[in-house]
Design a protein with these regions (language model features):
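Membrane-interface alpha helices of multi-pass inner-membrane proteins
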Residues: 182-198, 204-205, 209
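Perimembrane helix-loop-helix junctions
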Residues: 203-235
Length: 249
């Protein structure tokens, strides 16, 4: 009888931490609610500043003039990279070709800012478990990206949702390394960012790859690291080769 009583006491002791953990996770989910209103307001403000002010006051930088000229020139004749100089990605020039730097371009920039804020918040919240700090990081992000886009860095801005989406999957792995899910999607997202801003995306890929390498070496997950590399390469190639073939055709 005393043995059974001891088992019941141990069972209760084991349940208490579990119930406390569930309660804490529930509280965390409530405190880490997505600051959607903040993201929408900041995205609208940044879009107005970075696109409306340069056009209305004729303050467009040399990079902005060059990018929009490339989009206009594609309507005339020739091909990008061969007949016209271009340092940005193919999808970026395709967007400027379709939108011609007008209202539709502003819509795409606004959507990119909303998606970038969402994925950045989710990444920071996953790594820190602090919704308030993640929200503050989102505010800093919008302040920094205002200066970036105001100087003509539209391509990098449009690549950020893809890069942050990839980083959110990496953050999920770092917080729970018991699974290797999502690495093909990481490759797909990185390829999307590459075809908007190649140089910025390559720098981002190098930093994330170094971080994953250090993490896997520190946790002795050598086989997992090799598998992750193959999965990312597969996802990247699924976007890279068809798009590169189109640009060369």
């Amino acid at each position: 009888m005393s043995v059974y009583g001891r088992v019941e006491e141990v069972h209760k002791e084991n349940r208490e931490p579990l119930e406390y953990q569930i309660e804490q996770e529930s509280h965390h989910r409530e405190s880490s609610r997505l600051p959607l209103v903040k993201i929408l307001l900041w995205s609208t403000l940044v879009t107005g500043i970075t696109l409306g002010v340069p056009l209305l006051l004729d303050l467009m930088s040399a990079q902005e003039v060059q990018d929009f000229y490339a989009g206009w020139a594609l309507h005339q004749t020739g091909k990008i990279y061969s007949d016209y100089y271009g340092s940005q990605g193919l999808l970026y020039y395709l967007l400027t070709y379709v939108s011609q730097g007008g209202f539709f371009f502003a819509i795409f920039e606004w959507l990119a800012l909303v998606a970038g804020g969402f994925f950045l918040f989710r990444s920071a919240d996953t790594l820190t478990n602090q919704g308030d700090q993640a929200g503050q990081l989102v505010t800093i992000f919008y302040m920094l990206v205002t200066g970036l886009a105001f100087g003509g860095g539209y391509a990098t801005l449009l690549a950020l949702p893809f890069l942050f989406a990839a980083f959110s999957l990496v953050a999920a792995y770092l917080s729970n390394p018991s699974h290797d899910k999502g690495f093909v999607r990481i490759g797909l997202a990185l390829a999307g960012g590459f075809f908007f801003a190649p140089l910025s995306s390559l720098l981002f890929i190098a930093v994330v790859s170094l971080g994953l390498l250090v993490f896997n070496l520190g946790h002795r997950r050598f086989a997992h690291g090799f598998y992750q590399f193959l999965a990312v390469a597969l996802g990247f190639s699924l976007v890279f080769y068809p798009t590169a073939y189109y640009s060369a055709a």
